[in-house]
Amino acid sequence: MSLEDTLANMSLYDAKKYFRKAQNVVFNYTEMEGKVREATNNEPWGASSTLMDQISQGTYNFREREEILSMIFRRFTEKAGSEWRQIYKALQLLDYLIKHGSERFIDDTRNSINLIRILETFHYIDSQGRDQGINVRTRVKALIELLSDDNKIRAERKKARETAKKYKGVAGGSASADGSLNSKAGFTSTKVHGISVSADFDSDNEDNEDGSFSQNGYNDNASRATSTPGQGKQEPEDFVDFFSSESSKPSKELIQEDEKKADEEEDDDDEFSEFQSAVPVTNPANSFNLLNTSPIEGMPATTSSMPFYNSSTTDQGKITPAIAEPKKVDPFSSLFSTAKASAEAPSAPKASQAKAAASNPVSNSTTALSTDQDDDDEFGEMHGGAVQQEQNTNNNHTSSKEIDLLSF
């Protein structure tokens, strides 16, 4: 077909269509704005449902939603009364998007409801004397009532989903193929809660969270599962069936690992239990000093139940007590010896008592230490020094009658 034939067969409406496309390029309109302009043209027929459905998909995108809403409001404010068809079509498109579009779009429309209220006083009388503004006023009144009632919005959106499901859900007994359109547009509620109450309660008693409808049994996920019957429910790889014979080997290995871990824990517990059960055995009958291994007088020398005492008691005769030191370097020993020699005759009874006391230093020290059995063994040398000092003072008193060493 030649260009002349194409121009000859072109109607006035086709010329307007190409002219609008040229305007979109000149004024740098986006694709979504061009679709809105196409749906709100000045033709005597309404926009197609396919075009309005494509526009409703754009309400789920933030940028396209702003473009759609701004272009619709421009139709309200920039058009004259003679272009009442474009205003009426813009109101019709807005009503469709509220019922089928995103819930965020409803919130944005409510924020700009004052621009819609301006059209409540719209008037236009054509050349034939007919008031064409009554159609616009009626549509504006119904739209404001819809935006003011949340329950009505939920009911209308539910009805729109059911209607769309009848005509779009299934064709020829099989699930429809996924097209370029958004499957969520007007059929399921979004997860984002907006300002409107309808956004918060749109899914109550209407559809489930997985996209299924509770009343009529429609489930988007179920239809996808039935379309591919070969793909059944796959079990995870780590799942082990303990009741089947095939999984006996891995189950035995798991049981052996658990038993091994339990044995290790029991071994750790046994070590601590042995440590706690080792209660020290005390023997009050024989209180041994680590530095003095000789038992207390009057008590029979019995071996202790502790193993380290047995090794020390075997050499009691060989070990000399650390408390009583028989030989010690004393600068005044010569003076004591001369004093004892001179006073040996008159003080024989006292000297004999002193010799008896000196001959048995262990008994004196043990009797003195019997009162301090609960003290620490580290201070045993201090007690021994005190006993030896008492012996020296006794010897000084015995010889004080003849010679006073302090008088020098």
From Swiss-Prot:
The modification N-acetylserine is found at residue 2. It comes from the Eukaryota. It holds the Pfam family ENTH. GO terms for molecular function: clathrin binding; phosphatidylinositol-3,5-bisphosphate binding; phosphatidylinositol-3-phosphate binding; phospholipid binding. Residues 338-361 have a biased composition (Low complexity). Residues 211-231, 279-317, 362-371, 388-398 have a biased composition (Polar residues). It is a peripheral membrane protein. PANTHER family: CLATHRIN INTERACTOR 1, EPSIN/ENT-RELATED. Interacts with the clathrin adapter GGA2, and VPS27. Involved in the recruitment of clathrin to the Golgi network and endosomes to form clathrin coated vesicles. Plays a role in the trafficking of clathrin between the Golgi network and endosomes. Binds to membranes enriched in phosphatidylinositol-3,5-bisphosphate (PtdIns(3,5)P2) and, in association with VPS27, is involved in protein sorting at the multivesicular body (MVB). This is Epsin-3. It comes from Saccharomyces cerevisiae (strain ATCC 204508 / S288c). The gene is ENT3.
